[in-house]
Amino acid sequence: KGFALFSCLGKEVIIGILSVATLSNAQAKGISTDVQKADTSLYKSGQPMLLDEVKVTGSRAPLTQSQQSRMVTVLSRKDVNAAPVHSVNDLLKLVSGVDVRQRGPLGAQTDVSIRGGNYEQMTVLLNGINIGDPQTGHNAFDFPVDISEIERIEILEGPAASVYGTSSLLGAINIVTKANRTSSVTLHAASGSFGSVTSGGRINVARGKWNNQLSGSFMRTDGYNRNKAGALNTDFRSQKAFYQGFYDDDDLSISWHAGLSNKDFGSSTNYSSKYDDQFEHTFKTYTAVQAETRKGAVKWRPAIYWNHNYDRFELFRDHAERYPFNYHRTDVYGVNVNAYFDWTLGRTAFGAELRNEDLVSTNLGNPLSKPKHVKGTDNVIYKMG
């Protein structure tokens, strides 16, 4: 209608819109709760102040947080110390985008998910080593370290299957332990209501290029609830021990660790509301050795690890005659090699991983050709796997 004049004149009007957008550089900055404040006294004196960025785990090559091309949240040691929490599970509740569903007190058992997924769709790492359990993700957060031993926590949002495998569909969480370079001894203890007691300690010995540290912790509580018969059904007991060592020079750095987590807890109605006297025992061990070269055109980062898990679930606590206990044992062995090099167009990384997951169980998997005896029992066997 508005173009009737042009129509009378025998003219044709063509109207078009050309939209042009140029993306020269897009980068998802890592969201960090680690806020560093400049020391104004140094600024006024004219002295330069350098703040080293933390290298986070998000690719096969080490990158600082600002170089990451995906969403990364870093909880620093300062954040961990300032948070009014007693477990890693409670600490993760403070991070947006992370869903924490906890069963029992003091982090007895927790399901953690990222970006609306579930606990089976993310990878859990300890010092960059995948400690995922093929049996279940329910016990993924049975760490061998106490919260007081954590240096920082890195939460990587988004698929990371190319680095950590298919389990990291929606992201990964990496727990990095402290690596003090000076000799020291620390102890801590606390108590609370419902018979709650926590204690722990760490000893660190540093000699030149070598560093060794050993830590342990104990935690227990009577729980806050009882079953219909009046017995405790949310009680909890946990023992943890962790050793790690380092060798560091200009050409090479090597780190190794070994840890265990022993946990017993009344799981109440965790798996079925029909039975209120469930119980679970888990025992996990972790070992790993890593290295990184620092000279040469190509930097290499090999690692080898072994994770062992034993799990016993009791539908009726201490009464196997009412319903047989479920036993599971997993052994995960792995070796990986990552490498990277810098050149004109930036940094290129490549790597490979070989991982073997072995599961034997009384009720999970396929029938075994040769059943295996369950250690510590009289006549129970693993018949599936």
Task: Locate predicted features.
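Non-catalytic regulatory/gating segments with a bias toward low-complexity or hydrophobic composition
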Residues: L92, I153-E154, I173-I175, G245
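N-terminal periplasmic "start-of-domain" segments of outer-membrane beta-barrel proteins
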Residues: L50-N81, D111
